[in-house]
Design a protein with these regions (language model features):
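Short glycine-rich substrate-engagement loop in P-loop NTPases that contacts/grips substrate
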Residues: 84-89, 111, 126-165, 178-181
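N-terminal pre-Walker A segment at the start of P-loop NTPase domains
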Residues: 73-101
Length: 247
């Protein structure tokens, strides 16, 4: 693959308000990173061929059945609740700049209470990556912990390789129960590998600032250095959308 000029995760951006056409009633003080234009000498970004967006590929993404129709189009069609408009605005800007985000390994840390659409929007981003012809994989922390403990060494190695090398990895529901010995070491190694190789990660968590007290500082530094932090506030929306798939 031809060489791709990359941009720094933290050094080469400024923040300023950006208004996205078609999104209304968004606070004007919302800010997001605006990245310098990367110099690309090929038609690929991290191995993603941008001319392959129309291809229909059957890939194993790990997306739970409950979320399998959570494309961005479907999410917008059913309506964005008022309490979610601010984080949705930031996420829509991330999607608008998706090739750049993947190019520099920029991810998202989605924080907030249960039922506030964190997982739904993470899956919507995954579908956008797949639409570019890229690879994406979803795994909940509960399933990851279970897999690390229960599968054979060969199966575990295969899973770890997949988690390391997909273009976008979604780690869902990072919580208190995973700050334990061997699992914590595995998670830290995974985060370190993807940080060093500029691979994007989206993490959802119900933890707020408590996360800083639960995970080793080195790992948290890497998450924050390569992620935009997006806070979701408000009551659970699951009852409101009970006729739809779960938030």
């Amino acid at each position: 693959m031809d060489q791709i000029g990359r941009i720094s995760n933290q050094e080469n951006y400024n923040t300023k308000p950006v208004i996205s056409e078609g999104i209304k009633d968004v606070p004007l003080d919302v800010t997001i990173p605006i990245y310098e234009e990367p110099y690309i000498v090929s038609n690929e970004v991290n191995g993603i061929n941008l001319n392959r967006s129309s291809e229909k590929k059957k890939v194993k993404t790990g997306i739970p059945k409950r979320y399998q129709d959570m494309t961005l189009q479907n999410v917008v069609k059913r309506g964005i609740p008022d309490q979610t408009k601010s984080p949705f605005y930031v996420i829509s800007q991330y999607i608008d700049n998706l090739p750049k985000m993947l190019n520099c390994g920029q991810g998202l840390l989605l924080r907030g209470d249960v039922g506030t659409m964190k997982t739904t929007l993470a899956v919507a981003i995954m579908y956008e990556v797949l639409g570019l012809g890229g690879t994406a994989y979803f795994i909940s922390m509960a399933n990851l912990m279970d897999s690390l403990y229960s599968v054979s060494q060969e199966e575990r190695q295969s899973l770890e390789n997949k988690l390391k090398n997909v273009d976008l990895l979604v780690l869902d529901d990072l919580g208190l129960e995973y700050d334990k010995g061997w699992v914590s070491v595995k998670i830290r190694a995974l985060i370190n590998y993807r940080f060093d190789n500029q691979k994007s990660v989206i993490i959802t968590t119900n933890l707020g600032s408590d996360i800083k007290n639960l995970y080793l500082k080195g790992m948290l530094d890497r998450i924050e250095a390569s992620s935009m932090i997006v806070d979701f506030r408000g009551d659970s929306l699951r009852e409101r959308f009970r006729s739809f798939d779960s938030m």
